[in-house]
Amino acid sequence: MKLIIEETTEKMSESALQIVLGEMMQDKQVNISLTSGRSPEKMYEMMVPAIKGKAKYKDVQYWLFDENPYDGDEYGPNWYDMQKMIFGPAEIEDERVHHLTRENYTEYDEQVRRAGGIDVMVIGLGWDGHFCGNCPRCTPFDSLTYRFLYTDKQKLNPTYKDRPTQPYTYTMGPQSLMRVRRLVMIVNGSEKAEIQKRFIEEPINEDVPATILKLHPNLTVIADRDAATLLNPDGYENI
């Protein structure tokens, strides 16, 4: 694992974007997977003008790694958020955006494999240590893509809000992410300082499921200074 601490969220976003654009420049079909949420907002602001209308990125395929579909709808909030933050502004056609559904989740990993595998994935670190849709105390560490009944997840994580119109979570599991060639985690904000410290310092455990990702052979963690306030990089022998 490589740990990079940048002074600001903007610098963190620039570093992550450089990695993503570097992977996108490969002379082949490139497959990337990007996160929704707050952490990547600045990165997407920078990414839109960098890729919009650029022919050299026309073969890039985008894969969403989790979803909570609404009843009666093929899509969920992650799809809509990504359309708003990056796919719409960058004018990326729906045909190049692949997403998890009720029908395809059991075949999603095989679809990714047939497409050539994910070249780079950018994820965030959840406030409780979750990653993608893999949440505390209910993440099967040996699983590829799977679905989980949301009410069961909520029983194990009582602070989670009710989602009566979103009965299931569909997510790429830990073993799906282990197949990604380059994994980038971005972490920003002082509210993430405690969970960032736990992720770095604790052994692999179900209470902080993201700790399993430290086994990935090519993981880069990029944090801003606020998220890294509790870290002492000089004291980490294994980073």
Where are these regions (language model features)?
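Active-site histidine-anchored catalytic micro-motif
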Residues: 58-73, 117, 131, 140-144, ...
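Glycine-rich beta-strand-to-loop/alpha-helix junction loops that act as flexible
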Residues: 34-39, 123-127, 188
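Glycine-rich N-terminal segment of FAD-binding domains in flavoprotein oxidoreductases
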Residues: 26-51
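Ligand-binding beta-strand-loop-alpha-helix segment within the catalytic cores
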Residues: 55-122, 235
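A short secondary-structure junction signal
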Residues: 110, 132-137, 143, 195-199, ...
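ATP/nucleoside-binding phosphotransfer catalytic cores, i.e., glycine-rich phosphate-binding loops
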Residues: 180-239
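Class I SAM-dependent methyltransferase SAM-binding "motif I" and its flanking Rossmann-like core
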Residues: 127-175
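N-terminal glycine-/serine-/threonine-rich phosphate-binding loop
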Residues: 1-32
